[in-house]
């Protein structure tokens, strides 16, 4: 179920402070965050945000198409190594 429009998008306050500071200083260094639940706002466009995936911080460069999505959507948490090969098919 989607979030109510009257509530507006959710974004952690500490992340907003970091984004505002980076925008004011024109800093291109990635902003490190653990907040996968935060919605990407138009203020984030052009910034690189390092989103934690449970093991490391994955750099995510924010573009216009990402606005409205969550940060966690762009930092995958699972690594798929492939299914076991079928031994009968190899013969």
UniProtKB/Swiss-Prot annotation:
Family annotation (Pfam families): Ribosomal_S19 (PF00203)
Gene3D superfamilies: 30s Ribosomal Protein S19, Chain A
GO biological process, one term: ribosomal small subunit assembly
This protein's GO CC annotations: cytoplasm; small ribosomal subunit
Taxonomy, superkingdom: Bacteria
Keywords: Ribonucleoprotein, Ribosomal protein, RNA-binding, rRNA-binding
Molecular function (Gene Ontology), one example: structural constituent of ribosome
PROSITE patterns (UniProt xref): RIBOSOMAL_S19
Keyword Electron transport listed: no
Role description: Protein S19 forms a complex with S13 that binds strongly to the 16S ribosomal RNA.
Entries under NCBIfam families matching the protein: rpsS_bact (TIGR01050)
PANTHER family per UniProt: RIBOSOMAL PROTEIN S19P FAMILY MEMBER, SMALL RIBOSOMAL SUBUNIT PROTEIN US19M
Protein family: Belongs to the universal ribosomal protein uS19 family.
Protein name: Small ribosomal subunit protein uS19
UniProt source species: Paraburkholderia phymatum (strain DSM 17167 / CIP 108236 / LMG 21445 / STM815)
Organism phylogeny: Bacteria, Pseudomonadati, Pseudomonadota, Betaproteobacteria, Burkholderiales
